[in-house]
């Protein structure tokens, strides 16, 4: 069983006298920095000078400085910029200031797990990862609650790395719901697998394939969109709130019978074999290498795929129907 920490299990002792530098001020950076500051922790923000994020962070009341200045002043450096830019920023602007006993922290284990960032041996390496978009991290904190999260320790140089990570998690508001202790490997590999096979890859391809099947059979694209895409939210919300069994209990008997008797013909043994192959590519580093080469080349394949997605009929039909439903503005 996993270890779960709650508010009662965690104190601020390991972080209350430390300076925490949040590097980056996107959705997660802003939410985590504000929550920790409002929890009484000493937070500074490291950014590129004079950009939109710089001005926003100042307006939010933070002490804002360059990444180099923040890395030098901080005891804990919490990196919340995109995965693909982290290695270059780390090497040039953070690594020179990683003196003995400091902690380098992440919200995703990708670059540490695959070795794109290799901190010196005399620092802690930790992870504090909210399992929610940044906007919800902030909103629920302001409401007096929070979202669930993860903590992990890749290296405990000072002997209190876990307490440091947990103190940050408490400051962000995660321990009010519960924080699961994991590892950099487990977080990285399960996160990538979920994105590729279900959340971003599998679901979107299933939607498109079903939409195309109906349109090719002569059904109106608008009807196809409603039945294969628009109504998905209703089912996902039920699963989110009640679990799979709760979803089955809240759909019609016809939908339940049809789903239970036909689903294995859609997700079959070939599908499961493909899932295992994708997981293996994640585990052995092939995906990470492929993605690294794609970045270095300037994202040619990704940009081509983006163009194809934008040109698909489902996008044109969906845009019009979302406008009709008041979900998308002109």
From Swiss-Prot:
Keyword Metal-binding included in the entry's annotation: yes
Question: Any idea which positions bind Mg(2+) 1?
Answer: 191, 195
Query: What cofactor is this protein dependent on?
Result: Mg(2+)
InterPro entries, per this entry?
6-PGluconate_DH-like_C_sf, KARI, KARI_C, KARI_N, KARI_prok, NAD(P)-bd_dom_sf
The UniProt GO MF terms for this protein read: ketol-acid reductoisomerase activity; magnesium ion binding; NADP binding
Q: Which reaction does it catalyse?
A: (2R)-2,3-dihydroxy-3-methylbutanoate + NADP(+) = (2S)-2-acetolactate + NADPH + H(+); (2R,3R)-2,3-dihydroxy-3-methylpentanoate + NADP(+) = (S)-2-ethyl-2-hydroxy-3-oxobutanoate + NADPH + H(+)
Which pathway does UniProt place it in?
A: Amino-acid biosynthesis; L-isoleucine biosynthesis; L-isoleucine from 2-oxobutanoate: step 2/4; Amino-acid biosynthesis; L-valine biosynthesis; L-valine from pyruvate: step 2/4
Residues recorded as binding NADP(+), renumbered to this chain, are 25-28, 48, 53, 83-86, 134
| Ranges where the KARI C-terminal knotted domain occurs | 183-328
Report the domain of life of the source organism: Archaea
Q: Where does Mg(2+) 2 bind?
A: 191, 227, 231
Q: Where is the active site?
A: 108
Stated family? Belongs to the ketol-acid reductoisomerase family.
Q: Its function?
A: Involved in the biosynthesis of branched-chain amino acids (BCAA). Catalyzes an alkyl-migration followed by a ketol-acid reduction of (S)-2-acetolactate (S2AL) to yield (R)-2,3-dihydroxy-isovalerate. In the isomerase reaction, S2AL is rearranged via a Mg-dependent methyl migration to produce 3-hydroxy-3-methyl-2-ketobutyrate (HMKB). In the reductase reaction, this 2-ketoacid undergoes a metal-dependent reduction by NADPH to yield (R)-2,3-dihydroxy-isovalerate.
Q: What is this protein called?
A: Ketol-acid reductoisomerase (NADP(+))
Lineage of this protein's species?
A: Archaea, Methanobacteriati, Methanobacteriota, Methanomada group, Methanococci
Identify the coding gene. Answer: ilvC
